[in-house]
Amino acid sequence: CSYDEKFNEILGNKIENVFDVWGGCSGIQSGFQVTFNEGCVKRNVCPTVLANAMSVQPAKAFGIYGRKGDIKPGFDADLLIVDPEKEWEITSDSLLYVNKISAFVGMKGKGLPIMTMIRGNVVAEDGKIVAEKGVGTFIKKIK
């Protein structure tokens, strides 16, 4: 169960909408920068290897390679631009999700996404979401 009435005391309010419920240990926001720092910065892993592990292979596993996961003609222009020298520290205040709890809080490193594009449209820049809600689209598995 991701929500219990006991959390009302922690949050200070009653959650009425299921989409306001948080649970687990969040990491999606920080996952890339932590992986880049641990792999590419600390262990000299080639960024191409990281792109393969975090984009190409997941797209293949989910059956959407051919539209997602690579930079090729016919694929969506989903891109993440990284400044490999930009330093960062993950704090509770820097987390954009409802729960301000993450195993990554307190970590510091180098290599920060500075721009994110979905289908060629800039959706995030310098850590700020710049797109309107609803720019994403459901992708069905390619047969």
Residue ranges and their predicted role:
Residues F7-G23, D76-F138:
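C-terminal cap of metal-dependent C-N hydrolases
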Residues C1-K86:
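His/Asp/Glu-enriched, well-ordered alpha-helical/loop segment
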